[in-house]
A protein has these predicted regions:
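Short, hydrophobic/aromatic-rich segments at coil-to-beta transitions
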Residues: 1-4, 150
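Glycine-rich loop(s) and the adjacent beta-strand/alpha-helix scaffold that form part
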Residues: 3-100, 106, 171
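FAD-dependent oxidoreductase catalytic-site/capping-region signature
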Residues: 95-288, 296-305
Length: 305
């Protein structure tokens, strides 16, 4: 790797490294930069009239992400976090004072107040579903504001078998890549999501919750009808922003980096981000990604200091 071309305010600068370059743009950005640099599968690069400099068929492949389904229930009390006339005039002023003087109350909430790792089926060796309980009504990642009060529960598939990809739209470095997670393309993922949904609803329908619930804010779903559950999941499930795997570590033909994060066949280039994970972990990706950076710094210092 010779260096990098940097654009700032539409002006181009070229930088070079004395020892090696580190690529750390995430599971979407790292393969995008490599493909636009001519590193990756030849058919993907050449069709955009980019010079093909090194063949690595795994660049941009093996995309994995956690798919998540959210159930939301309206609540008949202002006890929980929400927006209403009662809460605006009678609750929020007191909550502000509680936070200012005692650091307690709803403004100390993490929103994800409780969680659980469960098995979608008893035959599973380890948990494959993660639940997040939230004491408020949030849909569409908070982009849509719901009036009133309620509670919700996220159901996340931890170990999906579906694999997606990141490809180029064009040779334009300012154009976003094509990102296709191919959620639920493996049939086992849907079956696990259906089983996980049923277990989640068993919890949400317990008396401790149901006696306060006014109605389900999403469309009604027949818990005994797998096809109804499947349709809801296909239409409403979404990402929780844990993409990995598009520059995976390994020694097989689809691997992009070795066990020192060095790009196969390219001198002086490492990838240091979540894209190097061969397989998505069964939990949040933040801490493991920090670990990757820490481990990479240790290996780099051992090589050069």
């Amino acid at each position: 790797a010779a260096g990098e071309c940097i654009n700032k305010d539409r002006k181009y600068f070229t930088g070079s490294a004395n020892q090696e370059g580190l690529l750390s743009s995430g599971a979407f950005g790292s393969p995008q930069i490599m493909l636009r640099s001519g590193i990756g599968p030849s058919e993907e690069i050449l069709k955009h009239d980019i010079e093909h400099t090194h063949d690595l068929p795994g660049v941009g492949k093996n995309l994995q992400d956690h798919i998540d389904y959210l159930t939301v229930h309206r609540y008949n009390s202002i006890e929980l976090i929400g927006i209403s006339l009662k809460s605006i005039f009678f609750k929020f002023p007191f909550e502000v004072l509680k936070y200012v003087f005692a650091k307690v109350g709803i403004f100390t909430s993490t929103v994800a107040e409780a969680g659980a790792f469960i098995k979608s089926k008893e035959s599973k060796d380890i948990p494959d579903i993660q639940l997040h309980f939230i004491p408020t009504m949030v849909v569409d990642h908070g982009r849509t504001t719901l009036w009133g009060h309620g509670l919700g529960c996220h159901m996340c598939l931890l170990r999906p078998k579906s694999r997606g990809e990141v490809t180029l739209k064009s040779s334009d470095p300012f154009e976003d890549p094509n990102i296709d997670p191919k959620f639920l393309s493996h049939p086992d993922d849907m079956q696990d999501m259906i089983a996980g949904y049923k277990k989640m609803m068993m919890i949400m329908n317990k008396d401790s919750f149901s006696k306060y619930t006014v109605n389900h804010t999403m469309r009604p779903i027949d818990i005994n009808d797998d096809s109804d559950i499947e349709q809801a999941i296909r239409e409403e499930a979404d990402t929780v922003y844990h993409p990995v795997g598009t520059c995976k570590m390994g020694n097989d033909e689809m691997a992009v980096v070795d066990n020192k994060l060095k790009v196969h066949g390219i001198d002086g280039l490492r990838v240091v981000d979540a894209s190097i994970m061969p397989t998505l972990i069964g939990g949040n990706t933040n801490a493991p990604t920090i670990m990757i950076g820490e481990k990479a710094s240790e290996m780099i210092m051992n090589d050069w200091i």
